[in-house]
A protein has these predicted regions:
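Short active-site oxyanion
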Residues: 46-52, 72-73, 161, 222-224, ...
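Short, acidic loop-to-helix structural element flanking the phosphoryl-transfer center
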Residues: 28-49, 94-101, 143-146, 201-215, ...
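Active-site phosphate-binding/coordination module
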Residues: 34-134
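Short, structured coil segments at secondary-structure junctions
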Residues: 69-71, 79, 87, 185, ...
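Asp-based phosphoryl-transfer active-site loop
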Residues: 6-27, 237
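Conserved acidic, metal-coordinating active-site core of Asp-based
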Residues: 114-227, 231-236, 248
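Residue-level signal for inorganic ion chemistry
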Residues: 44, 79, 162, 237, ...
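Mg2+-dependent phosphoryl-transfer enzymes with acidic/Ser/Thr/Gly-rich catalytic loops
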Residues: 4-8, 33-34, 198-286
């Protein structure tokens, strides 16, 4: 038996496992997983641990990345709207948006003319409305292609998540407007990045899906460990018995009760996390 038998470690990808913020803003190639993080994760798995990624990325944008990472657990996608097993190439759980989301968001388009957003689905299809430079950089970063439409009413269903991409005061105004709508409580609305505002189905959060994943794997909550850097990670950090964040995390994450701060993502935070887990799970406890 390994020292990490029965332990689940779930990590956010962007700016937690791999630092991608610079590439998103400037365009460029996705950086690889660092050698230090890779070796630490491989050691964790060799000692019986289950390593999973919990990401806001959609299936088409994470599918090319998954084979490059050491993972032995299913992946949480779409910010908690699905669990996907890359080994079996199938969804284990989905919680997609109701079709009515298109009618709910149509008036938002009217108020914010030229609204930029990405719309994701169960498969590899992506639709975009009014792409801007941020959208194009995001498409390059996620190695994705998309079909451009002019209205969300044209978008086919089912929809897994809607991702708005607006910057500056317009982005702030958009978030305030969306959160003020009478239907806002029917969905999950969360910032997943500095300029990203996402809508998923009610209950479709990383926290809800990490609970489901732990149950699926028969992992006790006391052995669930999570690490993340942004607001969309807070639900799973709150669920975890051992919650971590890299020092580049936003302030709200850093102030989450029980959070343990690590080095910056660019300084191999996940490698430090695994070293911390060695202290939590010494050999004599196995």
């Amino acid at each position: 038996m390994g020292r990490f038998d029965g332990v689940l470690l779930a990590s956010d990808f962007d700016n937690t496992l791999v630092y991608t913020e610079d590439v998103l803003l400037s365009g460029g190639v996705l950086p690889p997983l660092s050698r230090e993080n890779r070796e630490a994760i491989e050691y964790f798995m060799a000692e019986g641990g289950i390593f999973s990624v919990a990401t806001g990325r959609a299936l088409p944008s994470f599918a090319p990345i998954a084979p490059t990472l050491p993972m032995n657990g299913p992946t949480i996608l779409f910010n908690g709207a699905a669990i996907y097993d890359f080994a079996r190439k199938e969804y284990l759980v989905t919680a997609f948006l109701p079709d009515v989301i298109r009618e709910k968001l149509a008036p938002v388009e009217e108020v914010f003319s030229g609204l930029t957003c990405e719309i994701y689905h169960e498969g590899s299809d992506i639709h975009i409305l009014h792409p801007n430079e941020l959208t194009r950089n995001h498409m390059r970063l996620t190695n994705s292609t998309a079909v451009e439409l002019t209205s969300i009413l044209q978008v086919p269903t089912p929809i897994s998540k809607v991702l708005f991409e607006e910057t500056g005061q317009r982005g702030e105004a958009l978030e305030q407007y969306v959160r003020s709508q009478p239907w806002a409580g029917e969905f999950e609305i969360v910032k997943s990045g500095k300029y990203f505002l996402e809508i998923t189905a009610k209950g479709a959060t990383k926290g809800g899906m990490i609970r489901t994943l732990a149950e699926h794997l028969h992992i006790r909550r006391e052995n669930v460990c999570c690490v993340g850097d942004h607001l969309n990670d807070i639900p799973m950090l709150r669920f975890a018995s051992h919650a971590f964040a890299p020092r580049n995390a936003v302030e709200a994450v850093r102030q989450t009760p029980g959070i343990q701060l690590l080095r910056d993502c660019r300084e191999d935070a996940v490698a430090e996390l695994v070293a911390r887990l060695e202290e939590i799970y010494p050999p004599e406890k196995v």
